[in-house]
């Protein structure tokens, strides 16, 4: 029970990032930089309390991972601007699960048992259908919101997903294969946050207006850090499968938050579509967690 309660923290912390950042305001460049600065402050505090040993390999992996993460987060913030948080969030999370899962299976042979392949591919099919419903619009009475551009949103979502997936592969697979380096979240978080700041500056082409939005979004970076700490604690208390499952449920928080707190408009049909999409997404994520537990 304790592990489940701990897992609820990253669910709400990470799930709230999209709509909290958009509530604070600013463009994607300001949101990303603010978030990374907040993450750096959080990581520095953790480092000073824990004082882990940092080798050059760990620092390099963390820095590159942070750079890739920043690309992913910048793209995600942009996709939210163009499609809305309630649409972009499930599409982003789901695409990461599917593409990351497929690469893990075919490139790194993470599934070895027949039951893993059966449940895994069912999960991915469920996720794909969930994508469809999450983005589906009411053909008879579509709500037109100013600033929406699904083409630009999907483009941003594409490079966002690539950034996130490569970052996860680097940490989970390539760090061991290339450098034979093992690390935990509390050790890697500081060098990663340095890479995150550099990545945010690169994505902003070093031309980011240091307005109030940047400083407000530092709170979002702290939320990200808190989610990481509790994710680690939940995995220790309840196992990786439970922690992973609950972390993916954050999509419920972000979707509902986008509608309730950002006033994203939906017709009754679209609300039904979103509900179906969420149920399918959660089902697919839980199935993938079961697949992980079978390994």
UniProtKB/Swiss-Prot annotation:
GO CC terms in record: plasma membrane
Domain of life of the source: Bacteria
Keywords, ordered alphabetically: Cell membrane, Membrane, Sugar transport, Transmembrane, Transmembrane helix, Transport
Pfam families: Sugar_transport
Gene Ontology MF terms: carbohydrate transmembrane transporter activity
Major localization class: membrane
Subcellular localization, as worded in the UniProt entry: Cell membrane
Membrane topology, as annotated: Multi-pass membrane protein
Transmembrane segments: 4-26, 33-50, 54-72, 85-107, 117-135, 156-178, 188-206, 213-235, 241-263, 270-291
InterPro entries for this protein: Sugar_transport (IPR010651)
Family: Belongs to the GRP transporter (TC 2.A.7.5) family.
Protein name: Putative sugar uptake protein YxfA
Protein species of origin: Lactococcus lactis subsp. lactis (strain IL1403) (Streptococcus lactis)
Lineage of origin: Bacteria, Bacillati, Bacillota, Bacilli, Lactobacillales
The encoding gene: yxfA
């Amino acid at each position: 029970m304790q592990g489940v309660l701990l897992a609820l923290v990253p669910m709400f912390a990470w799930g709230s990032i999209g709509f909290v950042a958009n509530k604070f305001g600013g463009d994607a460049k300001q949101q990303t930089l603010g978030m990374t600065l907040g993450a750096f402050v959080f990581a520095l505090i953790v480092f000073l309390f824990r004082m882990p040993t940092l080798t050059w390999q760990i620092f390099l992996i963390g820095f590159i991972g942070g750079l890739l993460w920043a690309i992913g987060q910048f793209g995600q913030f942009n996709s939210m601007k163009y499609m809305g948080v309630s649409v972009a969030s499930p599409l982003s999370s789901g695409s990461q699960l599917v593409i990351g899962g497929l690469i893990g299976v075919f490139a790194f042979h993470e599934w070895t048992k027949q039951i893993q392949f059966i449940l895994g591919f069912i999960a991915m099919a469920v996720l794909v259908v969930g994508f469809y419903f999450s983005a589906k619009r009411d053909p008879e009475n579509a709500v037109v919101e100013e600033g929406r551009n699904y083409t630009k949103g999907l483009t941003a979502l594409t490079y966002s997903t690539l950034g996130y997936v490569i970052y996860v592969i680097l940490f989970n697979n390539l760090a061991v294969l290339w450098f034979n380096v093992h690390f935990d979240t509390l050790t890697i978080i500081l060098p990663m946050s340095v890479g995150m700041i550099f990545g945010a500056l690169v994505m902003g082409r070093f031309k980011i207006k240091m307005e109030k939005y940047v400083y407000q979004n530092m709170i979002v970076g702290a939320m990200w850090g808190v989610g990481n700490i509790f994710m680690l604690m939940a995995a220790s208390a309840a196992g990786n499968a439970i922690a992973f499952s609950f972390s993916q449920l954050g999509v419920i928080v972000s979707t509902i938050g986008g509608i309730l707190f950002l006033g994203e408009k939906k017709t009754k049909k679209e609300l039904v579509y979103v509900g179906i999409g969420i149920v399918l997404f959660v089902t697919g994520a839980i199935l993938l967690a079961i697949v992980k537990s079978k390994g």
